[in-house]
């Protein structure tokens, strides 16, 4: 196997297949890293070939470059951008548009210099400035003319863009008058980006509730008992447990779920977080002290979470994964139905284990509500506790469907419950991360 043509052909095939399968008019392909990095070279060579194969009139190369500010001399320097463009041109790619990443206005002189020495039209040098909110960037780039130069390069005749809805979103973000604190309990909290979709979904829900959302990061391995939970979680307005795999930190998550249930703090469990909710309920309400998941204790006596029956056997690990979009029926009178406002929904899944139906009736007899199931009623998709503002666990991943201007209904309901809880309780200060 060779880098060229085998790997580059595979990269191109992925791009072409995506365009064909989605019937897209335009495919946007981002090549990360820095020009000249060895890791990026096969990808850059592949997109160079795409331009030749599809015709340069059907391809627009946009190069994002850093324009650093030197405080000692109070000036922006264009040399790094010039060298980066020269490196890219040496690989056979001539940028059509150059986007200048800078903290402030670089000035017309810098833009003219980059235009001249990087061989692009002056109006194709676009500033991408540091903004108070990331969501202001589309408006900034539109005002700078990025849409016009891209459409011109691709010979696309498009109507004038209507960003009214986006402007309203920015206005809501700027005028938020409330703040709530959400504890995110997980095992990967040292790398916040591991929970990026969950973070953004919380922020989106905050926009709709006119509230800032501050995230209090909690490593589940530190939650050894209820005393530690009180230290870490006292004062938060809601607790969210996202997905994950493996047994590390599981006992701490169970402690957090117990604390949320006993203190009546809004709780949202996603995938593993739902399974944790079920395991805690089985231990502390049903009395099965050893209740667990067959993922962690394959030979356990009371595995309330188990591999689905039709997936048991000698199947490669990846083959047991339930992936993609599946329908779910919401039960009438539940928080799930209230949030969605309809009976049938569809959500994206990525899990291997499910609620063990051997314990279904017993769980329900002890108060746990099965609020969502597969259409045939066989698989439990969501559970909740009745009489709570929000104590919900879902087997699917709602964070994948949340958008800045269209918060996911479950996240929206969770933040609304957190704000209500905040009004009824004293708030304790944390050192959170803010959007």
Enumerate the language-model features and the residues they cover.
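N-terminal beta1-alpha1 cap of cysteine-dependent amidohydrolase-like domains
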Residues: 1-387, 398-435
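Short FAD-binding loop at a beta-strand-to-alpha-helix junction that anchors the flavin cofactor
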Residues: 390-396
């Amino acid at each position: 196997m060779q880098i060229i043509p085998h790997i580059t052909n595979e990269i191109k095939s992925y791009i072409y297949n995506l365009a064909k399968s989605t019937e897209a008019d335009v495919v946007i392909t981002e090549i990360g890293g820095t020009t000249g990095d060895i890791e990026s070279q096969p990808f850059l060579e592949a997109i160079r070939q795409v331009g030749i194969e599809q015709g340069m009139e059907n391809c627009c190369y946009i190069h994002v470059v850093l324009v650093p500010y030197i405080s000692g001399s109070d000036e922006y320097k264009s040399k790094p951008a010039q060298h980066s463009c020269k490196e890219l041109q040496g690989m056979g790619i001539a940028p059509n548009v150059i986007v200048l990443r800078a903290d402030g206005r670089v000035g017309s002189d810098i833009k003219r210099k980059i235009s001249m020495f990087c061989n692009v039209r002056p109006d194709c040098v676009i500033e991408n400035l540091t903004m108070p909110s990331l969501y202001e960037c589309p408006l900034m780039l539109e005002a700078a003319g990025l849409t016009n130069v891209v459409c011109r390069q691709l010979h696309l005749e498009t109507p004038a863009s209507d960003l009214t809805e986006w402007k309203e979103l920015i206005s809501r973000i700027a005028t938020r008058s409330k703040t709530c604190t959400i504890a995110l309990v997980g095992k990967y909290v040292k790398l916040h980006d591991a929970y990026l979709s969950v973070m953004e979904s919380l922020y989106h829900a905050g926009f709709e509730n006119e509230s800032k959302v501050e995230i209090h990061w909690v490593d589940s391995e530190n939650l050894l008992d209820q005393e530690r939970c009180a230290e870490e979680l006292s004062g938060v307005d809601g607790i969210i447990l996202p997905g994950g795999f493996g047994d590390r930190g599981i006992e701490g998550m169970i402690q957090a779920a117990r604390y949320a249930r006993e203190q009546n703090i809004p709780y949202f469990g996603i995938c593993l977080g739902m399974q944790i909710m079920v395991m805690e309920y089985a231990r502390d309400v049903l009395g099965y002290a050893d209740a667990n998941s067959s993922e962690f204790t394959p030979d356990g006596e009371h595995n309330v979470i188990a591999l689905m029956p039709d997936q048991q056997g000698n199947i490669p690990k990846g083959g047991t994964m339930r992936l993609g979009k599946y329908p779910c029926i919401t039960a009438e009178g539940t928080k799930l139905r209230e949030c969605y406002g309809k009976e049938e929904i569809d959500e994206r899944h990525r899990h291997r284990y499910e609620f063990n139906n051997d314990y279904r009736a017993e769980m329900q007899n002890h108060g746990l509500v099965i609020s969502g199931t597969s259409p045939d009623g066989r698989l439990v998709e969501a559970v909740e506790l009745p009489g709570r503002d929000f104590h919900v666990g879902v087997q699917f991943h709602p964070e994948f469907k949340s958008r800045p201007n269209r918060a996911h209904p479950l996240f929206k309901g969770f933040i609304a419950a957190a704000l209500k809880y905040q009004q009824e309780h004293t708030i304790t200060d944390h050192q959170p991360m803010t959007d």
